């Protein structure tokens, strides 16, 4: 028996073929655990997809991760992306969506945001591997002579590198590694990944691996039927690559019945209890409970020979809190990429998390930055309770963002700026309060007389675009008694960054004399990391991306305070409106 005292659980010896985890166990066996821990082989779950992309494999994998964690297991997650880009850092937001930044500076797929929010673990750049990064490593090894003159081929060299990336996460402090394979079975670029995970079974043992395949069960309107044929063809394609799925997760608009499950079971050679239905849900945080009711985690534990009790209580409490969040609040998101809302996925989820905390249902009003002038003209901006100005790159839409920041400042509308949002709020203040009419960022105007935002010194000679920004977690020292300091309630905080430009500190004294507070700086005081206004309910911004650290049960402090201020503004507006109505009614009677 291997005791894991520090986790409060026990795990059985690999020779017994079963991992057994029990809560609340203590005893004098810490040394035995340390001596024999290396014998325990972490379990692996591979999640593939078929029929169509964007089926929600990432949410399925994330929900499974949460369910396994609630069984006391130590879980980590990974995304394998078949595209040839080295990472998504230079990809167009309209094509890829959000770039999720990890603490160690990895620019990764947005699914890692789902992973972190669901399993409540900080992941690293190792949790995202692309075809581009894998080929880059293989070619670098060839140039070094690591292959000793052999012909470099997809099999074994590329597949070996893929397996190395998977195995890299299987450390001593992990019980289960969940790996999502991006793309769709049948795509030509996914073939090396399928071959690698097929081979992986023979290397770690059948009892240590589980294949989960996600498919679509579409509803055909004219016939009024749910169709299983796409699932059958997808599984046939997967089996032709040497992989027999242990479980099939069927995405559908409406629940599927036992009759369809029996049909899929018979056609795809999977036990009926291993055919899992993932129908559409009202909110994504319900999904772990629904998948548990379908038996997803139970059947995976059976495949992997894991015996671990489940405690769903905390997650049920979270979902109950989500369902009870009904107080309306309208937040305007002033963005450059609002046509693809996934470009702001973590911002959206962070706003929702803050809403859960306050019992509020956040309505996000999507506003294209270039359209702000028209919205101001017809007063639609006045219906907002709060504003978020998120990050982005390039000059398009900047003047609209600046006008939104001005509107929020002048009308006392709570406003939170993120990364580029902090920069445009700085420019707005310089122009309209300090009188620097042509103030700008040198990203947008190299000839400005007042470069209140300028490129960082160590970025001036950088020419490559990929992976060269100020990336990852950096510390900031907060000013006590400020809105930011009070929100965090910590003197020093760590946030994730992704930028090349910064507040130009040569202007700092002029800003501060006018009530503009630099409420957080880098430990060496060289970089301004947080700003706020002294005489405003909430006009706050950060050079960081705090949205990457919010959790559904622990909203980020800045988003929490934004929603709190927005609710207060809404309550005041409604109270004022009622008072005006009563006064008008009294005047009419008199």
For each feature predicted by the language model, list its residue ranges.
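Intrinsic low-complexity, disordered N-terminal segments enriched in polar/charged/small residues
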Residues: 2-4
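Flexible phosphate-sensing "switch/lid" loops adjacent to ATP/NTP-binding sites
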Residues: 20-21, 30-363, 369-386, 393-394, ...
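Cysteine-nucleophile active-site neighborhood
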Residues: 58, 62-66, 380-475, 480-483, ...
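Pocket-forming structural segment of enzyme catalytic cores
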Residues: 111-120, 427-529, 565-567, 580-588
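Glycine-rich phosphate/pyrophosphate-binding beta-alpha loops
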Residues: 500, 544-551
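Active-site beta-strand termini and strand-to-loop segments that position acidic
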Residues: 531-536
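Extracellular ligand-binding/catalytic regions of CAZymes and related secreted enzymes
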Residues: 553-590
